[in-house]
Curated annotation (Swiss-Prot):
The name this protein goes by in its record: tRNA(Ile)-lysidine synthase
Gene: tilS
Alphabetical UniProt keywords: ATP-binding, Cytoplasm, Ligase, Nucleotide-binding, tRNA processing
Note on domains (UniProt): The N-terminal region contains the highly conserved SGGXDS motif, predicted to be a P-loop motif involved in ATP binding.
InterPro entries listed in its UniProt record: Rossmann-like_a/b/a_fold, TilS/TtcA_N, tRNA_Ile_lys_synt, tRNA_Ile_lys_synt_N
Cellular localization per UniProt: Cytoplasm
Task of the protein: Ligates lysine onto the cytidine present at position 34 of the AUA codon-specific tRNA(Ile) that contains the anticodon CAU, in an ATP-dependent manner. Cytidine is converted to lysidine, thus changing the amino acid specificity of the tRNA from methionine to isoleucine.
Family: Belongs to the tRNA(Ile)-lysidine synthase family.
One Gene Ontology term from the biological process aspect of the record: tRNA modification
Top-tier EC class: ligase
GO MF: ATP binding; tRNA(Ile)-lysidine synthase activity
CDD domains: TilS_N (cd01992)
Residues binding ATP, per UniProt: S37, G38, G39, K40, D41, S42
Length: 425
């Protein structure tokens, strides 16, 4: 699918893409969480990212929209959802919150309450997707915010507000000039869903927009130039980027919270799972395999399913494990006999002389609390995935199981030590 945009808009988009070169590394490597209100600015943002995706410049973004319960217009909210779902092949994360009631409870303005709730939600989602937040602020919004902050007693930092990239929030519309935004607005007929509250002079921001800014613009104020006087476009440092390539270590497995999956639509689930696979340097799931995986999850039973690259395993009541088939946890342990160092799953531990490492044999038991307990039952209770159980190191002494090395699988788990060998280390 390609966005139906004019040649002039396409040229502007291409020019803006070149302008934001310092952010290319971040944009190319991480998915965007687009904050979409339905207004003209967020509409421009959405279509710009649609163009970037169609040009294969970015990974699939997702669309976030919050219904503030201020519009009192259920039909318009439905139209927003229908529009995004029918036009953009991206996951939709639509939330509804009674902001007026919450505002009254917190003793804050509607704008402050809505912004706080929205950003808290956006931060949570961006962390889940290992992505970054994108908002539709531009230079005129910057001037509005400066005056808003100054009226409320702000100081020097009021002039430095709304940076290009801060707190994992990216604002690419600052790369568009006001003339370019006007040209696009005149060239395109994208649906606009304005919030009724934007027209009300009950709110300070709207009074600034309707009375103060027109006077400044009439006197020759240039929002683009003013913004650039106080902001520099700089490449995000390695601390800001989620992961440094030089220090990145692919984990041996990942766990996906099933409660998070249950709250997502099927399209969002695929996006979410594919993000986890990407973190493991694996390819996205095929449509058929993903459907098989969803069918297994719906049954609420334990299951194990595999494709060419990974195992997907879940017990009846716990999270979904994703284990690459080349994972260290699926390879046999190694023993440095000289120093008696046991290595497995990227971890290691020193063992005492007299212990012989091995694997769990069928029906093997360990003496614990005066009882002989099957090791397979212990591993099941500890939620060790079935493919891993076969490779988990066991320490034997005199032909009997003495230690189940759970700490090599997960450092948070203690080793299971047989009754007669508590002092082995």
């Amino acid at each position: 699918m390609r966005d139906k945009i004019s040649e002039s808009t396409r040229n502007i988009f291409d020019t803006v893409w070149k302008r934001i070169f310092p952010f290319h590394e971040m944009i190319l490597s991480r998915p965007a969480v687009l904050s979409y209100s339905g207004g003209k600015d967020s509409s421009l943002l959405l279509h710009f990212y649609f163009w970037l995706w169609a040009e294969k410049k970015i990974p699939v973004p997702c669309i976030y929209h919050l219904d503030h319960s201020i519009r009192f217009n259920l039909e318009q909210e439905k139209k927003i959802l229908d529009y995004t779902e029918s036009t953009f092949p991206f996951p939709n994360l639509f939330k509804k919150k009674n902001i007026p009631a919450l505002s009254q409870k917190l003793g804050k303005t509607l704008e402050e309450t809505g912004r706080a709730f929205r950003y808290k939600d956006l931060e949570k989602i961006s962390n889940q997707y290992e992505g970054y937040i994108v908002t539709g602020h531009h230079s005129t919004d910057y001037l509005e915010t400066v005056f808003l902050n100054l009226i409320r007693g702000g100081g020097w930092n009021s002039l430095r507000t709304l940076g290009w990239y801060e707190k994992n929030r990216f604002r690419p519309l600052f790369a568009f000039t006001e003339d370019e935004i006007k040209t696009i607005s005149q060239s395109e007929s994208w649906p606009i869903f304005e919030d009724e509250s934007n027209q009300s002079n009950e709110y300070l921001r709207n009074r600034i927009r309707n009375y103060i800014l027109p006077l400044l613009l009439q006197e020759g104020a240039d929002p683009d130039r003013i913004y650039k006087n106080f902001h520099r476009m700089e490449k995000p440092t390695s601390k800001i980027l989620l992961k440094e390539v030089s220090s990145h270590k692919t984990p041996s497995f990942l766990k996906i919270d099933v409660w998070v999956l249950n709250d997502l639509s099927e399209r969002e689930r695929k996006f979410f799972i594919d993000r986890y696979l990407r973190s493991l340097n694996l390819h996205p799931t095929t449509r058929n395999f993903f459907q098989d995986l969803m069918d297994c999850l719906k049954k609420m039973n334990s299951f194990g399913i595999e494709n060419k690259e990974a195992w997907f395993w879940k017990s009846s009541s716990y999270d979904l494990y994703v284990i690459p088939k080349n994972s260290l946890c699926l390879k046999k342990f190694k023993l440095e006999s000289k120093n008696m160092i046991l290595k497995w799953n990227g971890s290691q531990k020193k063992i005492s002389p007299g212990f012989i490492p091995g694997l769990c044999s069928p029906g093997a038991k360990i003496r614990k609390n005066g009882m002989s307990i099957e090791i397979s039952e212990i591993l099941r209770q500890k939620e060790i995935p079935v493919p891993v159980r076969k490779m988990l190191p066991i320490l034997y002494r005199e032909g009997k199981v003495d230690v189940i090395c759970l700490s090599l699988w997960d450092p948070r788990l203690g080793d299971i030590v047989a009754d007669r060998s508590r002092n082995f280390i």
